[in-house]
């Protein structure tokens, strides 16, 4: 019996030590950590980071584009695209979801409603009164869809870039994410190797586009948010409480609203398979489909 107890204690130490090392120095995000540009919007669940970009006066068209990022990578994924929208005369609003980037990490269940209501709260806080153009990348796609269903009069158009919601869920793959304690241990211990593995696989040098992020720069920017408490909780809670695999019913409903829609998808997407375009076009048949041959899941920053 004594040997069993000693053995269990050794196993506990082996598991606890790397977890302690990885989590002990995590910081609480504060306003002093924010970039010089942008700020916090005080919402019901906490402070949400946002930043505005404005076109030159002579190009301004008085239209607002809101860029909604995906599961784990915050607003920097839009850096290479902003210039094109500004040149076209749009004002741009970017933000970080709760639990990501420079937004606070409330200890809550990260459900669909949290993301939809935070988008609504942000627009209200910024006194955006006119309908906006929503652009959703990956997880941002379902968020844009759900928001449009709930607030159709607030949306001018939708653009869906490699939208989540058309993936086949495999219960034998990454099952540990859904398990309490197990998921927390794995993600805290192995960090970016697990969190950003899908993006890393798709982010391969060399890059011909001067606006593209190198793998090194991507990991540096994406990993910055991991030094703050609550990031891993936000990812795990989102995976457990927001269905990112099957959003067909929602997209079918939003298709009935007949909002102008653009869908952009890469044929070699290893995260949200390109075959999802067939089902999306069934639900939103009026959508314009832009196919990027050999494009992968990192198409917003590659």
Language-model segments: residues:
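Alpha/beta-hydrolase fold catalytic core
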Residues: 1-63, 87-90, 248
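Flexible "cap/lid" loop of the alpha/beta hydrolase fold
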Residues: 149, 156-189
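Conserved HGGG/HGGXW glycine-rich cap/lid loop of the alpha/beta-hydrolase fold
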Residues: 53-102
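Conserved alpha/beta-hydrolase "acid-adjacent" motif
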Residues: 270-276
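Conserved alpha/beta-hydrolase catalytic His-Asp/Glu region
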Residues: 29, 189-255
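Catalytic histidine-centered segment of alpha/beta-hydrolase-like enzymes
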Residues: 271, 295-302
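Short beta-strand/loop motif that positions the catalytic acidic residue
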Residues: 257, 263-265, 269
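Active-site loop/oxyanion-hole signature of alpha/beta-hydrolase fold enzymes
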Residues: 43-45, 51-57, 87, 97-135, ...
